[in-house]
Amino acid sequence: MRITLFLFGFVTTNLLSAQSQLGPGDLHFLSFRTDAPVSFSFVIWSRLDHGSTLSFTDNGWAAQDSNSFTHQSEDVLEWVHTGSTPLLPGTVIGIGCSPAGAFATTGSVTGNLYDLSDQGDQLFAFHGRLDSLVLLAGIHFNGNGWESDRTDPHTSARPASIAMHAIGLTETDNAF
């Protein structure tokens, strides 16, 4: 019985530690392209171990409502580090998206963001699930920067938790 409990604890601890713990600023966006094919790239500033997961969405942030992603009708893409060696700070990762599917320069992806709008949109990186997340970074490319609240799929408030790691650009289709 003791051996079973020890093994269970050992395996559980190893599984839990496989996921790197990330916080605001541990990732920054380097580029985005809303013209087909949609793509974006980012740099990581923390070590990512095998199994680490990052998620991305073009949902807008609602400051007035609930300080969360409301109307979660837009897409979510999940990237997983599948390599056996850790990714080190300074590593750049690219994601490409089309109606046929999404791919990454390293790791694997599920979901797709091929509808990233050239009429203005936003892109957020987060750790966790949409209903329980840690925001890492954001970029907004609509109008004259961030709005005070989300009013449609092309608008977004700037989340306070990543204010130092959220870039607001004027209406732009592609930025490198």
Model-derived regions, located:
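Bacterial Sec-dependent N-terminal signal peptides
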Residues: 1-21
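Acidic glycine-/aspartate-rich tracts in secreted/extracellular proteins
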Residues: 34-35, 44-50, 60-63, 98-101, ...
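Active-site-surrounding "flap" and adjacent substrate/cofactor-binding loops of secreted or lumenal enzymes
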Residues: 52, 59-84
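Conserved beta-structured recognition patch
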Residues: 53-55, 112-176
